[in-house]
Swiss-Prot record:
This is Lutropin subunit beta. It holds the Pfam family Cys_knot. The gene is LHB. It comes from the Eukaryota. Disulfide bonds join 30-78, 44-93, 47-131, 55-109, 59-111, 114-121. It comes from Monodelphis domestica.
Length: 141
């Protein structure tokens, strides 16, 4: 009976790890996540912070241990599968300055190659994007 319990515990651990041998433990997988972003323009007096949905999380990857004649394979990143765009109006912009700031809103996410046309694939930053001007917070969600 004790051997059966050990096997059950081992199986549960493997299922919780996703069969990744420990690589995925305690790391949230790629999914839509709420994040606060900042929008500002050099011509407008106010920075606006707002909350939207972005793609974030862990994507499994492999790195070759031994050198190979082949180039390294692409590293997967958490990126948009489906998205829509929303916008906010920056307040106080002078006439002739476009006050509209548009941004992507994640509907679903997937692990895939980075597409710089609509993703920032640079990894985590030491400091988040911050306002350099007086700021106003908007609640969009």
């Amino acid at each position: 009976m004790e051997r059966y319990q050990e096997l059950t515990v081992l199986l549960l651990l493997l299922l919780l790890e996703g069969g990744s041998g420990g690589a995925g433990s305690f790391r949230p997988l790629c999914r839509p996540t709420n994040a606060t972003l900042a929008a500002e323009s050099d011509a407008c007096p106010v920075c606006v912070t707002f909350t939207t949905t972005i793609c974030a999380g862990y994507c499994p990857s492999m790195v070759r241990v031994l050198p190979a004649a082949l180039p390294p394979g692409p590293q997967l990143v958490c990126t948009y599968r489906e998205l829509t765009f929303s916008w906010i109006r920056l307040p106080g912009c002078p006439p002739g300055v476009d006050p509209i700031f548009s941004f992507p809103v994640a509907l679903s996410c997937a692990c895939g190659s980075c597409r710089l046309s609509h993703s920032d694939c640079g990894g985590p930053r030491a400091r988040p994007h911050l306002c350099t001007r007086p700021h106003l917070s908007l609640r969009l969600l």
